[in-house]
Amino acid sequence: MRRLVVVLALIAGFLVTPATAEAATGQLLRDDTGLYPRVIQLANGRILASVVTFVGNADGIGAIYESTNSGKSFTQVGTVEDPEAADGQGLCCATLFELPKPVGAMPAGTLLWAASVGASDRPMSLRIWKSNDVGRTWSYLSNCATASNTSGLWEPEFSIAKDGQLVCHYADETDPAHSQKLMQVWSSDGVTWTDPTPTVASTTVGHRPGMPVVRKLPTGTYLMSYEICGVGGQYDCAAYTRQSADGWNWGSPSAPGVLTRTADGKYFTHAPTLAVAPNGNLLVVGQILQNPDGSVAAGNGRTLFVKSGNGTWRTIPAPVAVTNPYNNYCPNYSSPLLVSPDSKRVLELASDYDAGVCKTYYATGRAG
């Protein structure tokens, strides 16, 4: 995806929208711009969600929402206001994470929020903020990566490796040998980051793996979902997965991984996300659902994939129905999923245009 175009369009206050379209189903999270939603369940049972939005003089902020009733309703409880993202300096693709164990001086339960900050006029960075009060207030922590040139760093994602280290995954455009690749760095304290290592990096310069999402399975194995763009043909930007036994070693970076598709050949392209149910079931969603021949499938914007263990992917209805999503930074773009503690329900947040504004909607449906 051309994320820099997205950032610049938002800074300019200009949104390219369809002429007329029915907005997504579900409830509105906020009644103005809400991009790149994320949702997590905390150890205390509360659900937190975040979106990127813009206020004032094109100030990019992270809006933090809380649900105390299993996702039936949300209330804004906090705001991440990074001065480096103020005055049109650019903000994109934020993530939200709760530490399940202490990392350095940060206790279990510390919240982390990170996003891509900057645009083409200065080196981009992945800036991390932390909260010790369940998302009410936030303070700057560190950068897990800073660009060495004017190319982009995108889509930060956190995980805790088997050895207890905090890992930051991201998409990197700064290497001339790769149009884009997936990278990871680790930290023992969340402040100092080290050992930048590729996780997905094609031997073809123009290939663009991106948008990593990492989850730990009940078995202890780690699973990463991502897209690979730049390949051309019907599988351009198709969704893939790969596994790691320890949350750091992901196999050969040049291997594309496993294509995410159903037994009858349907697959997702663009902006996939991944969720793991407590019972071990896996759920994925992508922006566009395609048929085996590459045509857009009838359930596009209204479908999730689910599978149990080593089974095959099958389709189920998506809680939020987005009408005919297409390759664009808003409709059904990187829609996060959260499965209930009993593994029976799934909460989805998905964005779509409403009267020319990209907004985020949420709803809950069956998880299988």
Task: For the regions a language model picked out, list residue spans one by one.
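Hydrophobic core segments of beta-strands in well-ordered, beta-rich domains
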Residues: R38-G56, T95-L99, A105-S120, R127-W129, ...
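Blade-loop segments of beta-propeller domains
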Residues: I61-I64, S73-V117
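Secretory targeting and sorting signals
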Residues: M1-A23
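Structural motif
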Residues: N57-I64, D121-R127, P176-M183, G232-T241, ...
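Asp-box/BNR beta-propeller loop motif
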Residues: A24-T25, Y65-G78, W129-L141, W186-D195, ...
